[in-house]
């Protein structure tokens, strides 16, 4: 199963980046840095702050936004600075464990022989459905199953073909999991008129409005 994407806003602190002599991590030096220090130093004192530790601390604070269930049980909203840049961080989960990070390549996944078959099956069949659900999760099926039947008729085969095609590129090449998701989004949302009357996304929108 795939975790929902979490948006994180980079820190607006300013300073000079240097390499820490003790832990070899990248360190920011400047005035007013209040992030946790490496090697157990106080979070309130000193000029150096380990960016790697701060990044992990920021991610942990937002981990409750990740959805690890097929059903949405709780929704959390994050408010960002209008002038800030939002970074999308995608993960793929298997049970309670993270199976793929944004930088994970297929060669890395093959090292875990216990779960590779399930991962391959998910990539070939369901990766596009997961992205679709993330993008259009506001669609609700009520009263009857007409929208669900409409989805099966117009979109299911199209999304399955995208999953198969993009997963082949991912498994044969040197792309990361983030790049795979970019391919899926690009293929899924294109409206290039491959079928009569417009692309599949246009057809789904038109059918949804007229249903």
Swiss-Prot record:
- Please give the family membership noted in the entry: Belongs to the UPF0329 family.
Provide the protein name. Answer: UPF0329 protein ECU07_1880/ECU10_0020
């Amino acid at each position: 199963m795939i975790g929902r994407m979490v948006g994180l806003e980079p820190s607006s602190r300013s300073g000079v980046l240097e390499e820490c002599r003790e832990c070899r991590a990248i360190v920011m030096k400047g005035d007013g840095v209040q992030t946790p220090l490496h090697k157990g130093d106080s979070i309130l004192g000193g000029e150096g702050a380990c960016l790697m530790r701060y990044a992990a601390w920021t991610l942990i604070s937002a981990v409750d936004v990740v959805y690890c269930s097929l059903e949405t049980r709780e929704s959390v909203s994050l408010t960002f600075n209008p002038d800030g840049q939002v970074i999308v961080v995608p993960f793929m989960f298997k049970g309670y464990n993270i199976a793929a990070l944004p930088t994970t390549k297929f060669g890395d996944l093959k090292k875990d022989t216990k779960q590779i078959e399930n991962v391959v099956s998910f990539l070939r069949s369901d990766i596009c459905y997961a992205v679709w659900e993330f993008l259009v999760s506001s669609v609700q099926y009520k009263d009857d199953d007409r929208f669900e039947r409409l989805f099966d008729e117009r979109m299911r085969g199209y999304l399955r073909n995208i999953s198969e095609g993009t997963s082949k590129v991912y498994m044969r090449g040197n792309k990361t999991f983030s790049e795979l998701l970019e391919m899926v989004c690009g293929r899924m949302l294109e409206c290039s008129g491959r079928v009569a009357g417009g692309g599949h996304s246009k057809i789904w929108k038109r059918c949804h409005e007229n249903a």
